Amino acid sequence: MIFSKLIDRYALYDLHKKRSGEFQYTSLSNTALDIKDIEFFYKVQPSNIHFNIKHAKQEKEYMVGQFKYKSSVQSGDSRNDSVTGELFLHENEDAPHVIFVHGWRMDSNERVKKIFHDHMTNLKWNMYYFTLPYHFERKPNQSLFSGEYMVSANIERTVQATRQAVADLRTLIKWIKANKNGPLILIGISLGGVITNLTALVESAIDVLASIFYANRLSYSIWKTNPGKFIRKDLEHHGVTYNDLIDYWKITEPSQALPKVKKENILLISGKHDLYVHREDTDYLWASWEKPTRYIYTCGHAGIVLKRKKIATDTINFIQNRLNPPHFPNVML
């Protein structure tokens, strides 16, 4: 326990070396944030999506490239409003299609790849690395670091960024389902787990969901955990209380409804000593979702690195078990 917390504390010290140079809070507009209809809020706008696969090259049995498409939720920043990502398409399109969603403030997908990529390449599965709003190449020029604008003291922008993330992810899911064969797997890590869990509330095309070191309530994460302390300071300076934030960000909580994914096809993984994501918050989601399969590791948030072999093994074993007959009788693994 002491070792896990020491590593998390060192990582948090490093995290806070980069922080916003000025307050991000902006006064709320007249637009009400009391949103109840999640189906409407997170809907995918009907459109003829032109899905670009560029810079493609062949690597063994894989076509490797990048994808890019226009977000259906426009923020007004041209960089952020272009959805981007990497893809690794196997010759066998009947193999599972796995979408990965990275964590908050990550600079690349390298941590995610180090957990899963080689294992899934050996399995000959198709892989898509999705980029969250305001991260990587979606980071606006004026932003100081990847992810600065996705979760911040700008209350409405955080809500809209969450909405954009879910809508963008659903667009990719629907494109895969319309153009490829094979089951669809969604894997989220940290903030990516929040987004995949939210997506599961409104998207029925997900066959298996795995959420790793996920949070549940952004309001809790900002107010109660160390990673959010400077955002909380910004909010408190402008008179926002914890109860205010709970109300404003209610629509971003995965625990607000049951997912459309079958309970037996959901895997949740948490760290017992996580200083980024508290057990109280992860327990809340687990109970709200009627207690799907859950693994609790003896580690902190740094388990993303220290426990990556176990994460990969447990997650892939769970997926394979769910894809075996009688769950998916036509799937060839």
Residue ranges and their predicted role:
Residues 261-262, 267-270, 274:
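Short beta-strand/loop motif that positions the catalytic acidic residue
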Residues 187-192, 196:
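Gly/Ala-rich beta-loop-alpha elbow adjacent to hydrolase catalytic centers
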Residues 300-312:
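Catalytic histidine-centered segment of alpha/beta-hydrolase-like enzymes
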Residues 95-103:
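Short beta-strand element of the alpha/beta-hydrolase
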Residues 105-109, 114-163:
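Cap/lid segment of the alpha/beta-hydrolase catalytic domain
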Residues 1-68, 330-333:
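N-terminal targeting or regulatory segments adjacent to alpha/beta-hydrolase or S9 domains
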Residues 197-242, 296:
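Hydrolase active-site cap/lid region
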Residues 275-281:
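Conserved alpha/beta-hydrolase "acid-adjacent" motif
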